[in-house]
UniProtKB/Swiss-Prot annotation:
PANTHER family listed in its UniProt record: GENE 12695-RELATED, SIMILAR TO HYPOTHETICAL PROTEIN MGC34837
Protein name, as recorded: Uncharacterized protein C1orf87
Biological source species: Homo sapiens
Region (Disordered) location: 37-101, 269-300, 392-443
Ranges annotated as biased composition (Low complexity): 284-298
Sequence ranges of Basic and acidic residues compositional bias: 81-93, 274-283
S-S pairs: none
Amino acid sequence: MSSAWKTPRGSDAMPEIMVKIIGSKHFQYLVEKPKIKENDSLKTETQTMHQKPMTDNARQMSRDTPVPINFTDQQTTDNPDDVKEKKHPENNQKSENNQKLLTGANSSRFLDGNIPSQANVHCSSVPTGDQSLSYVHGIPRRKLRDWSLEQMVRGSSDQPEDIGQSPSGTTNEDAFLLALVRRELKSRPLSSNLLEKLQKELKILDPISSGFLLQSQLSRLFLKHEVPLQLPTVKILCQRFSKRGSPEMVNYEKLLWFLNSAASDYPQQNKAAADLRKTESHGTHSQSTPPQHSSSQPEVNRSLLEILKMALRTTNGRLNIDNLNLSFRKEDRSFSGCLPLPKVRAICGKHGLYLTLSLLETLLNHQDLGYQNEIKWQNFVEMLTRASSDLLSDLPTGKNEKKAPAPPMEPEVPEMSQSKTEHMKTPEEELQPESSPAETSACKDPLKPLKIRPVSQPFVNPAVKNKAEECETWIDRFRKLENALYLCDLSNTGVLEKERARRLIHNYNLIYNLSLSPQKIDQALRRFRSGENMLLEPALRYLKEL
């Protein structure tokens, strides 16, 4: 192409704008082509088109300041045709003058002929005939962080006060988030009753006490209780307290704690507590609970003993604490003295002691029992022995006489278990204290000693208490159903497949004669389902209360 554009000595040369597209960008430069007589009419038209804006803008450029950066000067150095232009200094000088005029014409397309700051312009070369500013591209910036939260908080009047008081332990995001939540709670503050309702329903939605729920569940719950927070704020809160591995899971305990601190009237105490929460998240989860109970530790111990007494009353004296201790010792393979909550619950369930999730949380929050989301089983066994001894001392005199042979038989159990294996001796040890009182109290009926679990017979003498006996036996049979369902949950997740749970409940309903109607079973399955699974604890509680 350059050989065809050589200018003869006697011919006039006219500058022409050439445009190249390199990498989705337009680059223009000026070249001088010979003026051919055949195309005079075409060239005059193009010359008038280019020279009109040149002459108009030349006057404007004389008054305005020169353009700071000439983009065409940078591009002409890489053009191979410019090497030949350097041989003709007159033509080269003309092209430079025309080039300056063209850049001035292009600059007039911006506001009042001034090019905006060059940091915001990525390509300012002009394609031919383009009157829109589509050739101006913004420089691609690095996406640092989401400043929407900061801008929303800056719109409030009290934002500088909140940030000014933020201690060094809290980050700017936490300070902004705290200020944003407080600003939205000004018109309608959160009440303690609403927070308690939220906490109860969150625990129902989380039957295994994992501490995490889906963002959709939290959003629906907040809409249900009309929490005075906007949906973008709720989304930001969920992102702030989300799990590292799975961002859809939210730590609802920390979120509720944050809302409670934001709703209170003492910001300095809240931020000091936030610092404690920061340090707690790096360490253990249960280290912040002992100071809460340290002031009233004897009262907490007494209330915990009362709760354990209530749990022991449901066993009807069948719990052998020594066997329970041996099972805990066998399960503790690391000899740490601590076991997780699912294992503690499963072992206690095998021995006839059924612990609810609320009771397990109480044990975990106790100063002497909880450690790093695990339970110190040795201290738990000691507290169980204290509760059982207090329960025996609280019984009336008539029942003490009947239950008197039971305590001396307990120390015989470990002596027998030392000589034989633990697994073979556990059912025999449970049957020995049951058969001896059955023989003494009911010798008239020869078939009574052959029954598997005649637990309620030695304690019920009058015929008036037949209804109470039937209720106790129904509860025992229902506990067999509970134990079977929990044993099917091998991973201790607290949920079971809905169809499998339906089949098991119907089968055990017929086997143990529980008299549960199929409509009630279907209603429990529909009400307490999570996707294709069923939540075990609330469904069983619902069936038990029928």
